[in-house]
Every structure is written in C-alpha cells, then in structure tokens.
C-alpha cells in the first residue's frame, strides 16, 4: 500500500489540473446535496474542534494539492469568491476560506455547519460520483465501490469497473480519471476524517466490467 500511495501522490500533480471532476468543488463552490450522508453515504463521525474564532481548520498536505501551488489555489479561491459575491451565490459556499501556508500546504477554514458538507463532497468525489447527485460521473465507469473500510468508516481502497474498449481508447487519460483523481479526493476525505496528512493512503483497483479481470 505504501508503494501505491507514493505512486499516486507523485501522479497527483500531473492529472488533477485536467480533471473535470473537480469542477463541482472549484473555488468556493456550490452547496453539495444536503442528504449526502444518507444510508449509502459516509459513516465516519469525526469532527475536529473549533478554534477560538469558531472555525474548523483542515490542512491538506502538499501531496493533495491537485496540480497547483497553495498560493495559486488561494488566489483562485479569492477571485471566485468575488464572482460569487457579485452573482449573489456566496452564501452557498461550503467553506469560509482557503489559505496558503508557508510550508506549501493549504488550509480550509469552515464553520461547524459547513464541515460535514465539504467532507461528504470529498467522500462522493472519491468514488467517482457527482457531489450533488451522488451518481457516477463518468459514462465509461459502470461501478465504483469503496473497499478496505476500517472500523471508523474510513475507506482505504477503491474498486472501479470500466468499459474496457472506452478505457483503452484513451488509456493515459482514463487511467488518471479512475485512479489518481479519486485517490486525491479520497485522500482529502481521509484527512477530513482525522487521518494525518502524511499518512493518507489509497489503493485503486481497475477492472474490466465484462470479464472482471484486473486491468
């Protein structure tokens, strides 16, 4: 698992900049589905304490930046917040701020009410589902199921079944879509569940939907 973790971490910066799945969490984003933690949703109940300002602070390691620097993410977030304010949609934000740290990491600042919404969004994105509808977001993916779920409800693995013909037609792209991208999203979910930033780990298995063989 450690070897797979390192491979996915190194590949994260290569792919996340081109991944459409991240669109639903771009900038301050829209509000994910309110009932995203239903029967088939996340079961982890961890909630970190609030600071003296009433904020929950979640820091993401550099291995989960998603292909950009922390400073770039902060600048983009501020720009998108200005646009949202002009459009009258800022109240839908799922966190209050995204700020770069001196060590190259970045931190989310959230209220206690916002925290479970962003946490649930990462849960769904980690298994290739739309954060709003919780439906699989890629047509060539027939199934995506979490595996290796621990006693705290934290998944450490993902099995993805794909249409092999489509997958191989653009293997470099589609391989990234079903491995690196969900690994980063699930890695962020793990951090939201209290996993230290240097201990996140995800193993992704891709299978041919017709034969069940591992690709």
What are these regions (language model features)?
Residues 3-15:
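Bacterial N-terminal signal peptides that target proteins for export
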Residues 23-27:
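C-terminal motif of bacterial Sec signal peptides marking the signal peptidase cleavage site
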Residues 31-215:
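Mature, Sec-exported extracytoplasmic domains of Gram-positive
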């Amino acid at each position: 698992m450690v070897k797979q973790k390192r491979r996915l971490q190194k590949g994260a910066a290569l792919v996340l900049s081109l991944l459409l799945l991240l669109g639903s969490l771009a900038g301050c984003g829209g509000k994910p589905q309110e009932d995203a933690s239903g029967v088939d949703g996340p079961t982890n109940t961890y909630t970190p304490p609030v600071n003296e300002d009433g904020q929950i602070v979640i820091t993401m390691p550099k291995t989960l930046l998603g292909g950009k620097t922390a400073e770039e993410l902060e600048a983009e977030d501020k720009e998108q917040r200005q646009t949202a304010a002009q459009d009258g949609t800022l109240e839908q934000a799922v966190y209050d701020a995204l700020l770069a740290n001196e060590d190259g990491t970045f931190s989310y600042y959230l209220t206690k009410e916002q925290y479970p919404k962003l946490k649930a969004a990462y849960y769904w994105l980690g298994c290739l589902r739309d954060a709003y509808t919780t439906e699989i977001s890629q047509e060539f993916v027939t199934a995506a199921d979490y595996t290796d779920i621990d006693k705290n409800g934290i998944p450490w693995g993902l099995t993805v079944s794909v249409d092999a013909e489509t997958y191989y037609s653009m293997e470099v792209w589609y391989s990234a879509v079903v491995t690196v991208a969900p690994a980063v999203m699930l890695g962020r979910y793990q951090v939201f569940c209290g996993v230290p930033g240097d201990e996140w780990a995800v193993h992704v298995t891709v299978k041919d939907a017709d034969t069940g063989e591992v690709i």
